[in-house]
């Protein structure tokens, strides 16, 4: 049985988070992505940094985490992007069925008509 998973990635701009979200859904690596504005405080290069970031949460399955990680690592503007995942322990049957209908374990983008 597929394990539902939520992948979290932070971005410096809303635009970069939206671009990645669209690509993850287009590639069928995620059923849906949500973007929220957040304030992050972290230690980076010997300094404490406080800045506005945009958190992308991708709804997917654990089997697709590696594909998402590879995509993000290859396209992200940060030197060390946050790419974390958490298993969803509870979700409605209908939501899981919908998620399953939206993703593709091969990670291949669907053929689209022009």
Curated annotation (Swiss-Prot):
One GO process term, biological-process aspect: response to metal ion
InterPro entries: Ion_tolerance_CutA, N-reg_PII-like_a/b, N-reg_PII/ATP_PRibTrfase_C
PANTHER family linked: DIVALENT CATION TOLERANCE CUTA-RELATED, FI09726P
Source domain of life: Eukaryota
Family: Belongs to the CutA family.
Pfam families: CutA1 (PF03091)
Organism for this UniProt entry: Encephalitozoon cuniculi (strain GB-M1) (Microsporidian parasite)
Gene Ontology MF annotations: copper ion binding
Subunit-structure text: Homotrimer.
Protein's recorded name: Probable divalent-cation tolerance protein cutA homolog
